[in-house]
């Protein structure tokens, strides 16, 4: 089952959270859903070179809070905040509501599946060897602490006559385990030979949502188990002895 479904959608509500957090009913739900899609398209288009990983949207009555996770916050903010102010104004004109924009930095882009997939796709578009781009991405992620990485490219790789699939993997990626923290992304690279699909799985370890971590300052203490009493050995009865 883990091979057939989206790795993040498979874990929603268990160890993963939703990227849109609001509640609505009927036609209002449809309207807000389409509005979220348009907002994400606008932000991704305006911040195409800023390395945006994901966009989280939270709604209240007359306010929308948007959190943008990026590897290059300086490009998003701009000189003296001009870029972020321009983007905020464009979003407010589109929605007619007050927008609160939060810019959050990703400190290790090599461990973010979306950014890794976009990097590989960009290199393939620039005619870099797809094998080299995939292998370097896997090695960088493993060097920074990933427990497993898998990269798959499919299409007319290297301008081949027939499309094929090529994979690079290192470590383990347990896609069936719900508590496994797996980051996943899928992008498309547009080349002169057609479109190349890039998929990335990054396994970062296991997460136990119900486990309570104990404070190191207060280690758990248990009462010592008493040693079992030693019994005296009874003398062996001689069966040959006469009564």
UniProtKB/Swiss-Prot annotation:
UniProt keyword Transferase, yes or no: no
Disulfide bonds: none
Pfam families listed in its UniProt record: KH_2, Ribosomal_S3_C
Domain KH type-2: 39-107
GO molecular function, a single term: structural constituent of ribosome
Keywords: Ribonucleoprotein, Ribosomal protein, RNA-binding, rRNA-binding
One term under GO cellular component: cytosolic small ribosomal subunit
HAMAP family assigned: Ribosomal_uS3_B (MF_01309_B)
Protein role: Binds the lower part of the 30S subunit head. Binds mRNA in the 70S ribosome, positioning it for translation.
Listed name of the protein: Small ribosomal subunit protein uS3
Species whose genome carries this gene: Chloroflexus aurantiacus (strain ATCC 29366 / DSM 635 / J-10-fl)
Lineage, broadest ranks: Bacteria, Bacillati, Chloroflexota, Chloroflexia, Chloroflexales
């Amino acid at each position: 089952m883990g091979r057939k479904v989206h790795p993040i959608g498979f874990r929603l509500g268990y160890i993963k959270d939703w990227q849109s957090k609001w509640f609505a009913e009927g036609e209002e739900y449809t309207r807000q859903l389409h509005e979220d899609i348009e907002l994400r398209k606008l932000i991704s288009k305006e911040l195409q070179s800023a390395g945006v990983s994901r966009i989280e949207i939270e709604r209240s009555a007359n306010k929308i809070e948007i959190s943008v996770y990026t590897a290059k916050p300086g490009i998003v903010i701009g000189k003296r905040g001009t870029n972020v102010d321009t983007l905020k104004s464009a979003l407010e004109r589109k929605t007619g509501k007050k927008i609160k924009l939060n810019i959050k930095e990703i400190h290790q882009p090599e461990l973010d599946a979306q950014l890794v997939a976009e990097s590989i796709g960009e290199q393939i578009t620039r005619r870099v060897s797809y094998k080299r781009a995939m292998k370097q991405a896997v090695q960088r992620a493993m060097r920074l602490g990933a427990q497993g990485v898998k990269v798959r490219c499919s299409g007319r790789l290297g301008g081949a006559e027939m499309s094929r699939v090529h994979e690079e993997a290192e470590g383990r990626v347990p896609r069936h385990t719900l508590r496994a923290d797996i980051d996943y992304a899928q992008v498309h690279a547009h080349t002169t030979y057609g479109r190349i699909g890039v998929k990335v799985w990054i396994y970062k370890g296991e997460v136990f949502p119900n486990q309570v971590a104990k404070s190191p300052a207060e280690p758990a203490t248990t009462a010592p188990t008493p040693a079992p009493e030693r019994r005296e050995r009874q003398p062996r009865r001689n069966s040959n002895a006469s009564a």
